[in-house]
Structure formats: structure tokens, C-alpha cells
């Protein structure tokens, strides 16, 4: 059963809020970053990747964020426009802030890492005054990402967007997206992530991310069922807990659980899997698919993206996912 109800007759299917950055992915693989000489530039940031993936699957998508007043900022907005994402609510920073950069290292399919430059970044300067209630109420769903909660004024902007979404019956998806380097302490992180999760209809995260959110509760041992049930006392209708190569489990308020597998593929790198999973999973739910079917779409999309060099550029179309699912081996 799909427990989500999306309001009809709205021009946007999904509006994403938060991080817009640039990924610089290593062209030379099987070596450490110290020996990498060239990188390829892509648009990055978890909410950006999810929005791009959703748009490529056919959802009418918009974005609320902030970019730097330079070539990198223009590269980001231009790419979003090229992918049919509305950029009317992406103001340009005027304080001299820069675009966040993510350098990736691909030593092997199992050994990948990301070096982030996140000081004085434009996306964290998004101000609450730049969040339009009228824009949000035109959407069926809102996607928020945890990284945008790391600092003010972006933090307050996200919470205002959440309030507008709740006011206008906009379904809220929360992609936990925990990046420790943007936070001051584990306690600060847990507090704000929990506050955002309490207002969300669908929460998507890894087991490790949910463990972080439960730090202050002093649980002796993490348990997926207990984790999910905690959020059902708030707004959550679906809680998805991802376990990497072991697939994912989706829990619903009516007590059901659904296990999603993965599809066998030739892995190039590990990053991008979560964003591609989320974009296709959200798409499936918004198309009225049952949760297991939406999870299969997410798993297939993730397998496609981790077999390719980029994240945003690699986001598949619906036809590409269907073709992949027809031939790939599903591991449940």
C-alpha cells in the first residue's frame, strides 16, 4: 500500500531545497588523490542530484537554493535549466561566498572518498526571506536535505519551508544526508535532524544516519523497527532505512515492512547511490506505485549510477531504468 496522498492540479510535482555545489570527480581511478591529475566537473549536492534525477524521470521540478556570483554559480543554474528544473527561486549570493567543491577519489569500487570544501559557501546563506510560501504551495511534494540544516540562515530557511509545506498539504520527503564536516557537534546535529524529521512524511537514511539521530537517546542497540516506530508518532508515514549492499527496508505506519534488494552491476564508485535511489523511489511513489515497486525503481537507478563516472549526469530516464531491470540480475 502507498499511504501518500498528493494534491492534484499543482504545477510542480517536486521542489527541492538546499545544497548546490560542484563535484570534481577523478578521471584517473585505481590511485589516491595525491596522484590524480585531472578531474571532470559536474553539478553536485544531494538535493540537486535528487532533483535532477526526478526531472529526468519526468517530474515537474523546482529548486530553492542559493548560488555564488561567479562562473561556478552560473554553471549550476545553467545545468539545472538545461535539465528542465525551474530556477526562479535560486537567488545569487552578494556577499562574496563561493560554491562548495567536492573532490572525489576512486581508488577502487570499494574504496572511494570525498574531499569537501565547505567554508563560506553560498548555499548555506539562503535566507528565510528568500523562501516563498506561494512557490511551495504550488508543489505536490517538498524535498529537504540534512546538510542545509548545518548553519544559519539556511537552517531557518529550511524550517520555514517545512512550515509552509505543512500549512499547504505538501508532502515532505527528508533525505538525511549527514555530512559530519559541516557540523560543530554530534548533539547539535541530532537536535536539528530530529526537529526536521518530526515534520516529515517520508524519512530516508542509512542505518548509520539514523544511529546519529538517536545519539541523544542512549539506545543500547539500534533496531530498525524501533527506529521507524519512533517517527510514526509524529508525521512520518514511511521510513526507509538503507543498508548499503544489503538493500533497504521501508516501514509504514500500519505496521508493514518491505525489503528492497539491489541489482547486480559493474561498480565504478559508491557515491551517488543514495541520491539516485531517492529520486527514483520518490518518482515511483508520486506515480502511485506500491512501496515495493518504488523501491525496485530506486534500487535499479542506484545500480545504474554507481556504474558510471558522474552522479548528476548519470541519473537515468524511465526508459533506461526499465531496460536495465529487464536484463540485470536482482539480488534480494
From Swiss-Prot:
It comes from the Bacteria. Catalyzes the phosphorylation of 5-dehydro-2-deoxy-D-gluconate (2-deoxy-5-keto-D-gluconate or DKG) to 6-phospho-5-dehydro-2-deoxy-D-gluconate (DKGP). The keyword Signal does not apply. PROSITE patterns: PFKB_KINASES_2. PANTHER family: 5-DEHYDRO-2-DEOXYGLUCONOKINASE, HEXOKINASE FAMILY MEMBER. Pfam families: PfkB. The keyword Kinase applies. Pathway: Polyol metabolism; myo-inositol degradation into acetyl-CoA; acetyl-CoA from myo-inositol: step 5/7. Its EC number is 2.7.1.92. It comes from Bacillus thuringiensis subsp. konkukian (strain 97-27). GO terms for molecular function: 5-dehydro-2-deoxygluconokinase activity; ATP binding. The gene is iolC. This is 5-dehydro-2-deoxygluconokinase. GO terms for biological process: inositol catabolic process. Belongs to the carbohydrate kinase PfkB family.
Amino acid at each position: 500500500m502507498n499511504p501518500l496522498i498528493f494534491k492534484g492540479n499543482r504545477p510542480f510535482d517536486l521542489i527541492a531545497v538546499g545544497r548546490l555545489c560542484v563535484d570534481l570527480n577523478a578521471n584517473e581511478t585505481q590511485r589516491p588523490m595525491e596522484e590524480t591529475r585531472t578531474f571532470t566537473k559536474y553539478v553536485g549536492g544531494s538535493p540537486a542530484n535528487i532533483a535532477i534525477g526526478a526531472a529526468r524521470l519526468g517530474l515537474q521540478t523546482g529548486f530553492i537554493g542559493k548560488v555564488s556570483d561567479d562562473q561556478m554559480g552560473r554553471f549550476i543554474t545553467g545545468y539545472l535549466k538545461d535539465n528542465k528544473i525551474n530556477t526562479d527561486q535560486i537567488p545569487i549570493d552578494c556577499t562574496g561566498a563561493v560554491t562548495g567543491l567536492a573532490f572525489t577519489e576512486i581508488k577502487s569500487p570499494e574504496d572511494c572518498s570525498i574531499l569537501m570544501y565547505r567554508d563560506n559557501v553560498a548555499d548555506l546563506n539562503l535566507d528565510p526571506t528568500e523562501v516563498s510560501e506561494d512557490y511551495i504551495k504550488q508543489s505536490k511534494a517538498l524535498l529537504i536535505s540534512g546538510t542545509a540544516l548545518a548553519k544559519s540562515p539556511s537552517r531557518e530557511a529550511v524550517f520555514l519551508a517545512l512550515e509552509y509545506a505543512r500549512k499547504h498539504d505538501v508532502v515532505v520527503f527528508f533525505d538525511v544526508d549527514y555530512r559530519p564536516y559541516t557540523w560543530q557537534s554530534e548533539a547539535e546535529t541530532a537536535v536539528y535532524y530530529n526537529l526536521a524529521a518530526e515534520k516529515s512524511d517520508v524519512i530516508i537514511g542509512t542505518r548509520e544516519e539514523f544511529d546519529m539521530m538517536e545519539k541523544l537517546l542512549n539506545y543500547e542497540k539500534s533496531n530498525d523497527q524501533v527506529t521507524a516506530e519512533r517517527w510514526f508518532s509524529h508525521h512520518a508515514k514511511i521510513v526507509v532505512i538503507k543498508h548499503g549492499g544489503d538493500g533497504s527496508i521501508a516501514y509504514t505506519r500500519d505496521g508493514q515492512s518491505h525489503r528492497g534488494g539491489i541489482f547486480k552491476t559493474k561498480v565504478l564508485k559508491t557515491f551517488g547511490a543514495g541520491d539516485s535511489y531517492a529520486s527514483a523511489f520518490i518518482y515511483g511513489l508520486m506515480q502511485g506505485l506500491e512501496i515495493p515497486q518504488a523501491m525496485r525503481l530506486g534500487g535499479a537507478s542506484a545500480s545504474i549510477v554507481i556504474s558510471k563516472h558522474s552522479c548528476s549526469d548519470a541519473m537515468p530516464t524511465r526508459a533506461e531504468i526499465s531496460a536495465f531491470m529487464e536484463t540485470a540480475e536482482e539480488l534480494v
